[in-house]
Amino acid sequence: VDIDPAIRGLAEQHFLKDRARGEFIAEDARRFVTDTTRRFDAVVVDVYSARMSIPAHLVTREFWAASRQALKPDGVMLANLILDGRLATPYARNLLATIESVYGRCGIDVLHRGQAVSNVVVVCYSNPAGAPAAVYSDERNRADTDVIRAN
């Protein structure tokens, strides 16, 4: 799915060196995940409106919720984001918090940690495994029990 129909030809010519084998859909990503009735094993979000800018309508809770709805029950969402490599700016913190408000805990890999600009890969599952996580405290510390159960 890409909003620009010319992307298919560019991808086939410069990256694939052959015709794309899958279906290409020229449509806005948000409109697609909102309107589709199909369910996918994976949704990859790799969208930019400029070198370091993601379109505003693709960073909202509503977009991420629609992307999750487009997944099969055991599906995975992978997002390639451009953020600061320290994850310290309000934009980086807020975008990651928005994604995790929909998906729960996600894996986050900063490719150039500490740099002003970095690719940040986020991996989330449509149905995270296990029961809700508990917080260890001095009053209720079950860490040793959890370690034994895990082994």
For each feature predicted by the language model, list its residue ranges:
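Soluble small-group transferase modules, centered on the S-adenosyl donor enzyme superfamily
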Residues: 105-151
